[in-house]
């Protein structure tokens, strides 16, 4: 049973990509806050349905238990019919236009995109809206857009796209240099995760079994 199978059968998915921070309140009632870690993705997945206790599922369950916390897998939130809205694209470009965009450069939490190969962009187009998912095509990491990006923002065939965290360099991305790569958008984006916590399972009448709690998947940063 793969992690993707768990996600595909989810009843609910809780998503947390907030940066880790701390807060202390002094005896003089002065509040101090500090960032303690980067914004990585955490998914808390509940699976409410029952599974048939057959040879196939029993074998997959055993595989799932053996993975523990050490096995990394790639997942998406939109593989199952009816879930595409979770990572849906809110801009107005079509798939061909998005496929013609390349990454020109990056700095901090900003991707600079090359639109020189894109045809048919209208001045009224929204390239990306807040919350859109974007992933360099050769990268492990997915980012979320934090500011609307319009066609009118394009200057000399380049446009800046602010995202929710700093762009990971090649040294933290398996040696992949994202400059010159294309982009994956919305439902084409993926996450590399490990299962930090997995529930036990309970056998039910009728040759069925259910999971007793939620799965917690955490993004793996190299």
Language-model segments: what does each one mean?
Residues 1-222:
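Extracellular/virion structural assembly segments
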């Amino acid at each position: 049973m793969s992690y993707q199978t768990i996600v595909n059968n989810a009843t609910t998915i809780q998503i947390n990509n907030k940066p880790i921070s701390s807060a202390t309140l002094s005896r003089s009632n002065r509040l101090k806050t500090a960032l303690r870690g980067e914004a990585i993705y955490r998914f808390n997945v509940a699976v409410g349905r029952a599974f048939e206790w057959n040879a196939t599922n029993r074998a997959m369950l055993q595989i799932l238990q053996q993975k523990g916390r050490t096995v990394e897998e790639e997942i998406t939130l939109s593989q199952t019919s009816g879930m595409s809205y979770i990572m849906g694209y809110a801009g107005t470009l079509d798939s061909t236009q998005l496929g013609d965009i390349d990454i020109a450069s990056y700095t901090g939490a900003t991707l600079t995109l090359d639109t020189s190969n894109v045809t048919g962009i209208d001045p009224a187009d929204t390239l990306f809206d807040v919350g859109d998912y974007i992933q360099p095509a050769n990268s492990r990491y997915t980012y979320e857009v934090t500011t609307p990006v319009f066609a009118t923002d394009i200057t000399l065939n380049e446009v800046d796209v602010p995202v929710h965290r700093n762009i990971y360099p090649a040294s933290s991305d398996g040696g992949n240099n994202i400059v010159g790569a294309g982009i994956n958008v919305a439902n084409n984006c993926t996450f590399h995760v490990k299962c930090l916590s997995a529930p036990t399972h309970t056998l039910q009448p009728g040759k069925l079994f259910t999971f007793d709690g939620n799965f917690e998947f955490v993004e793996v940063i190299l």
